[in-house]
Amino acid sequence: LTCHTCPYNTCANSETCPAGKNICYQKKWEEHQGERIERRCVANCPKLGSNDKSLLCCRRDDCN
């Protein structure tokens, strides 16, 4: 599995997920500097936090 890893809306960077991390993850939230994005490989889909705008977990290459 490969997942996007950059903190931008348009993302060309991907990484191969290590063993045990078979979910691609993307979280968006607002800070005083504007919208922030986090993308990576995870073992479990985290819960949506109170400050989060959106949360995406998926299991296809570069789906985040």
Swiss-Prot record:
Gene3D superfamilies recorded: CD59 (2.10.60.10)
Pfam families, A to Z: Toxin_cobra-type
Disulfide bonds: 3-24, 6-11, 17-41, 45-57, 58-63
Gene Ontology cellular-component annotations: extracellular region
Distribution of this protein across tissues and organs: Expressed by the venom gland.
Highest taxon of source: Eukaryota
Secretion signal, residue range per the UniProt entry: none
Sorted UniProt keywords: Acetylcholine receptor inhibiting toxin, Disulfide bond, Ion channel impairing toxin, Neurotoxin, Postsynaptic neurotoxin, Secreted, Toxin
GO MF term set: acetylcholine receptor inhibitor activity; ion channel regulator activity; toxin activity
Compartments, as annotated in UniProt: Secreted
GO terms under biological process: modulation of receptor activity in another organism
Role noted for this protein: Produces peripheral paralysis by blocking neuromuscular transmission at the postsynaptic site. Very weak inhibitor of the endogenous nicotinic acetylcholine receptors (nAChR) in the human rhabdomyosarcoma TE 671 cell line. Not toxic to mice by intraperitoneal injection or to zebrafish by injection at the back of the dorsolateral region.
Stated family: Belongs to the three-finger toxin family. Ancestral subfamily.
Protein's UniProt name: Long neurotoxin MS2
Native source organism of the sequence: Micrurus surinamensis
